Amino acid sequence: MMLKITESYKTAVISTAHVTAADSERLPIACFDPLDDRGLNWVHGTQYGWIVRAGMRGNDWKEELRDYGISQEAISNIQAIRDAGYDSVQFDCDAELVDGMPAWDW
């Protein structure tokens, strides 16, 4: 059977070390919560990190993350992933570090 998929996106899976310790406390607040319709509907928590679907937001995503207190360093790392051709980034504590990308040991 041939599936007809009309929408897809490309995700990079990278270490949670590519966000600061402060970001690791702020990202859960930015994550969408469908029970109370709070947070950004393109940022999602996982058991081991977060998925940020910045490519689904046009140009407003940086400002929206800043509004939640996400650091410029983390935003720059997400932009680097976007510039490499990815639509979203999954920060996972078990994923590898990306050579040349700023990271923090927290």
List where the protein language model places each region:
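A short, structural micro-pattern
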Residues: 8, 44-46, 83-85
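Short, surface-exposed beta-strand/loop "edge" segments at domain boundaries and coil↔beta transitions
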Residues: 20-22, 59-63, 96-101
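Short, compact, well-ordered microdomains
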Residues: 67-106
